[in-house]
Amino acid sequence: MDFKRVSYLGWCFVLVLVGLWMVEAKGKDEEDDDVVVHEWKEYSAVYNFGDSNSDTGTFSAAFAAVFPPNAQSFPGNLLPKRNCDGRLIIDFICEELRMPYLSSYLDSIDSNYNYGANFAAGGSSIRQTGFSPIHFGLQISQFIQFKSRTMALYNQTSHTGVDVPVKSRLPKSMDFSNALYTIDIGQNDLSFGFMSSDPRSIRSTIPDILTQFSLGLQHNFMTLVLVLLQQLFKEGARFFWIHNTGPIGCLPRQNMVNKTTPEDLDSAGCRNFENEIAQEFNKQLKEIVFELRQKLAPAMFTYVDVYSAKYELIKNARNQGEYVS
């Protein structure tokens, strides 16, 4: 495939996201067709959590090098760190906020965390069982350690009056509560389920997956999601930008690993079953976001419909001069 065209497709996707940039999800009792548009806010930093959709160096630092064609159209043509020929959505978000690209928390070479850090890792999932050991809960633990060590350094230097050069590569202690927390995770939980168990049982695992996600933001897959998000809230996070999962049934590997018949596909050539599961996941994720908005009232939660943006690009690829095979 022509990678210049792929980059063009990526730009189209970003334009769709920019259209959603400051759109906040509304509550269950409000009309879905309505949106609330907020004024532009200046964030002091960005902290990202997720999988290969937003990994800017964790996998390459922790496990194995990322080889071309990855990064071949990345600005500066640097050492490949992303599973993408160019920039990821998180890169465009940083550009839009006029910030440098995020350094991976585990990348020890030439990293700068003055404007945030990236904890996402290729293959990561919400639950601990998956393709990668760096699951969502561990990413949050890494963030907590990062914040704790940063705060300790500032406290130490404030008492001694001695400035430490490394502070120039770290965020200010007050930046954590004024940062944007971006999250794009969950696709690997579903993909791992498709590969390792009866596909028809995947739907029943979604509530457990999202429980763990919620626990991470607060403090168990819908319950874990809830707990994890609450955990981030306890650490001072107030501005959340949460992507739903993409159309998994449109991934080429789904047609490669499954015996596919024409009846299994929709008009865009995507597998119906996998996409139905993804849509069910997104429906429950959206409900979790609404619940968190009510529970954690001071915080702002923005739910981003990445599924629709990606599906429309895939469905209309020919109209954009791109051929998808």
Predicted ranges, named:
Residues 2-325:
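Conserved active-site regions of diverse hydrolases
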